[in-house]
């Protein structure tokens, strides 16, 4: 069964496990503004990692500030997207935040949306454009996203996809790169092929594949309000069964005065 870790009245979102699974980095609003925190995976007191006064509790059109994206493979830093570029608060840049506390440092990539480190930490797969929070479907305009790789050792970028549709939320599992695309009009998970067209590995028709997140062996994503796990080794997708235990006071019967509803 699922176990609740946070209970603050504000939002806690974008959780990411550390490489060894012992910690969780996430965004939260404990002190009014959205900041990045880290806590033990089994639960406990969160530690605040960032202190910059963000753009406010209501997100800009480009998305939430301080979005946690990944950890460095050595577990020493948390990769976050922060909205503080001089040419617009809608635009975000990747920063590395020490997991034990310290000054955040901007990465070489000038602007980006979703992104993730390669398993060896030498590259980042990312989208230069951030549009994950827009609600337009089947968008084919100038800000449709494509997937790129940035080589951190050589400070060089390479474009992987070039399609009028949206290609976003890229993740890395072993040697394979997966991303969400609506090139067939519903967002599904695709595998990048260096020598050919990307291959769809899920076939959802009713709802979009949203927020894919990867670990060493699998990709987990949301679809139609449910969580699914895709295993690249076997090419299988299965819906996760999540049980939330609790007293659920909102479901308990209670007496109310119904006089105003009687005519």
For each feature predicted by the language model, list its residue ranges.
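Short glycine/proline-enriched coil/turn segments at helix->beta-strand junctions
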Residues: 110-111, 173-175, 194-196, 216-217
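A flexible loop/linker signature enriched in serine peptidases of the S9 family
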Residues: 1, 6-12, 25-37, 41, ...
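Short coil/turn linkers that define WD40 beta-propeller blade boundaries
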Residues: 43-44, 101-102, 155, 195-197, ...
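Generic recognition of flexible, low-complexity loop/linker segments
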Residues: 134-136, 215-216, 263
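Structural signature of eukaryotic scaffold interfaces centered on beta-propeller domains
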Residues: 18, 72, 118, 256-261
């Amino acid at each position: 069964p699922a176990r609740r870790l946070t209970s603050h009245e504000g939002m806690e979102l974008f959780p990411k496990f550390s490489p060894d699974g012992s910690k969780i980095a996430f965004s939260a609003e404990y002190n009014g503004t959205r900041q990045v925190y880290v806590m033990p995976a089994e639960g406990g007191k969160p530690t605040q990692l960032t202190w910059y006064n963000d753009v406010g509790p209501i997100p800009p059109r480009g998305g939430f500030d301080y979005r946690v994206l990944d950890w460095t493979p050595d577990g020493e830093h948390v990769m976050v997207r922060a909205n503080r570029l001089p040419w617009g608060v809608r635009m975000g840049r990747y920063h590395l935040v020490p997991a034990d506390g310290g000054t955040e440092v901007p990465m070489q990539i000038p602007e980006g949306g979703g992104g993730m480190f390669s398993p060896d930490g030498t590259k980042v797969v990312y989208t230069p454009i951030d549009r994950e929070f827009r609600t337009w479907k089947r968008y084919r305009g100038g800000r449709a996203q494509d997937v790129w790789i940035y080589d951190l050792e050589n400070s060089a970028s390479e474009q992987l996809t070039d399609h009028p549709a949206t290609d976003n939320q890229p993740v890395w599992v072993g040697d394979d790169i997966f991303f969400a695309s609506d090139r067939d009009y519903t967002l599904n998970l695709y595998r990048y092929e260096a020598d050919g067209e990307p291959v769809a590995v899920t076939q959802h028709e009713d709802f979009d594949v949203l927020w894919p997140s990867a670990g060493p062996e699998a990709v987990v994503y949301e679809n139609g309000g449910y969580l699914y796990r895709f295993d690249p080794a076997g090419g299988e997708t299965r819906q996760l069964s999540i049980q939330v235990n609790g007293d659920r006071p909102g479901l308990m019967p209670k007496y109310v005065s119904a006089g105003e509803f009687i005519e």
